[in-house]
């Protein structure tokens, strides 16, 4: 701990990786259902997008993101292993893009204001893996592998969240890797 510069108590658990842009760190976590004692009701699930000052470790802002659609139960093969905050955010320096599983892909400005949120499906695989895909940015598009939720890979316009195109086998997949 002698090299530890700062430490911040988060509002919940998470398996996503933090990202850094200039002097800010962005990360996701979740609280309520499936957190801590692993009890509670699915209606209590809350995701959080947290912005931290990289120099001081102080929270700059937080967004609480209540699911818009029911998520997989905290059981099965995937969700108990990684929880409800496995997707790593992405940024282009103008917005933060966060995959919220069955609640879709959302964009926030760097001050935490929600710009848009777009559904990409709400299905579940038989094994209930849960979601772990992370958005990828290229040019004017943000990509998400939503094979669990929407049976497709989606490209959305960064500016407004409208779906530019989608491709997929129209079948469930076991893993969610996206390569660009």
Put a short name on every predicted segment.
Residues 1-180:
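Noncatalytic, solvent-exposed loop/strand surfaces
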